[in-house]
């Protein structure tokens, strides 16, 4: 029997080509990814204030690359995203708050939005890594479900994601979003080299190191989510805890 995940993802069909969005800037991509992430991880404080959005953009965990952007940079990115209808500002609060409109604009299911957000926040990842990293946004039944949605995203015209060539010594292909434009093989090779710090390691040792790093990252992310939730309940700016 076909799962709901797979049946949803198999509806790519013969859809008409959508109007292409202009490529997002790095800060626009980070802002969009943070809005999607925090919608699920800290729903009590969503839509996000500018301060909370800045904290999410600049946090040191679960981000690749780590950024240090100013509120002025974020406001400029928000203006650009508003022009694409990907972000809008809520009108029910005295403090400006922002939310994304990604699912409607891109016309993709929520599962695909979760995958795109994680690719925006963490860069190229395998389907297995995406299943793990999106756990707080959407619970995929298995890796095959993730791959089905990735294949569907890749089938759009123009595509939203691309499967990258397998890196030397890697067991799986990684996926990368195309919301910031096309990616070159050379650029991906540079990214892979930065990920490993240019070091050479045996495949088994490298896989173990990656697994250990991923486990630590997930623990820190869960603790951060708890802190963000508690700070929201207490009305305390979350950056006081994260600086």
UniProtKB/Swiss-Prot annotation:
It holds the Pfam family DUF480. Residues 1-23 are annotated as: Disordered. Gene3D superfamilies: Winged helix-like DNA-binding domain superfamily/Winged helix DNA-binding domain (1.10.10.10). It comes from the Bacteria. Belongs to the UPF0502 family. This is UPF0502 protein H16_B1091. It comes from Cupriavidus necator (strain ATCC 17699 / DSM 428 / KCTC 22496 / NCIMB 10442 / H16 / Stanier 337).
């Amino acid at each position: 029997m076909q799962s709901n995940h797979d049946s949803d993802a198999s509806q790519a069909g013969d859809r008409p080509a959508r109007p292409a969005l202009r490529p997002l800037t790095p800060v626009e991509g980070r802002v969009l990814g943070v809005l999607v992430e925090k919608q699920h991880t800290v729903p009590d404080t969503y839509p996000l204030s500018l301060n909370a959005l800045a904290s999410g953009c600049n946090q040191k965990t679960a981000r690749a690359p780590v950024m240090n952007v100013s509120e002025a940079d974020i406001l400029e990115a928000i203006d650009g995203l508003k022009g694409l209808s990907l972000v809008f500002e809520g009108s029910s609060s005295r403090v400006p708050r922002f939310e994304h409109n990604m699912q409607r604009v891109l016309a993709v299911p929520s599962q695909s939005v979760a995958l795109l957000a994680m690719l925006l926040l963490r860069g190229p990842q395998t389907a297995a890594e995406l299943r793990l990293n999106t756990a707080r946004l959407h619970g995929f039944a298995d890796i095959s479900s993730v791959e089905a949605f990735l294949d569907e995203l890749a089938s759009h015209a123009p595509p939203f994601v691309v499967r990258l060539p397998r890196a030397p010594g890697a067991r799986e292909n990684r996926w990368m979003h195309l919301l910031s434009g096309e990616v070159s093989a050379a650029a991906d090779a540079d990214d892979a080299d930065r990920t490993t710090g240019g070091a050479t390691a045996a495949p088994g040792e490298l896989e173990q190191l990656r697994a250990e790093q991923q486990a630590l990252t997930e623990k820190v992310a869960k603790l951060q989510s708890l802190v963000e939730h508690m700070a929201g309940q207490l009305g305390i700016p979350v950056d006081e805890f994260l600086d």
